[in-house]
Amino acid sequence: MALEALTSPRLASPIPPLFEDSSVFHGVEHWTKGKRSKRSRSDFHHQNLTEEEYLAFCLMLLARDNRQPPPPPAVEKLSYKCSVCDKTFSSYQALGGHKASHRKNLSQTLSGGGDDHSTSSATTTSAVTTGSGKSHVCTICNKSFPSGQALGGHKRCHYEGNNNINTSSVSNSEGAGSTSHVSSSHRGFDLNIPPIPEFSMVNGDDEVMSPMPAKKPRFDFPVKLQL
């Protein structure tokens, strides 16, 4: 309605006497600012303004307003601090990338060797915790890791070492079994095999002995005749 009022031929006509009178205009301006006077109020109410004219008048007052919008509130910059070297970073992603360098240096130190005391102290001082403040500790060698995935990969080393020990023991036991088998083969029999039943066999060249008692052999001597 305000645009129609501005473009209407009625408003295109010369300014009505209300706006020509500077005293009345300033009185209306004071009334809009909160400082009202009896004279301006009475002069303003004596004029018969339609709704469209009143809206056009309000638009003119708004166009003369020189106030600027308030500046936006300053965004508070959050700083993320490293718990190892006390460096600050603008974002959590930058802090995570910085902590990865600490973990890399720690792994290189552990792989390089050193006495147990220095290794344990380095592990305790440069132990990196997760965002929740919890650290994952190995129950076998008491090493701490920043995540559960790293701890799981570390425990595989322990499991693979145990498997190698088991395979070596199995190979040793197999070697012992083969040695016992060879020694038993040298003896001519195996204790794990039941014995074969023995039968009374006689050589083929010998005669079969009868169960009857043998007869006494007869000796024939030549008879000498005496003449």
Swiss-Prot record:
Residues 119-128 have a biased composition (Low complexity). Induction: By salt, cold and drought stresses. Down-regulated by gibberellin. A zinc finger (C2H2-type) spans 80-102, 136-158. It is found in: Nucleus. Residues 174-186 have a biased composition (Polar residues). Expressed in roots, stems and leaves. This is Zinc finger protein ZAT10. Residues 96-128, 168-189 are annotated as: Disordered. It holds the Pfam family zf-C2H2_6. It comes from the Eukaryota. GO terms for biological process: cellular response to hypoxia; multicellular organism growth; negative regulation of DNA-templated transcription; photoprotection; photosynthesis; response to abscisic acid; response to chitin; response to cold. GO terms for cellular component: nucleus. Its main location: nucleus. The lineage of its organism: Eukaryota, Viridiplantae, Streptophyta, Embryophyta, Tracheophyta.
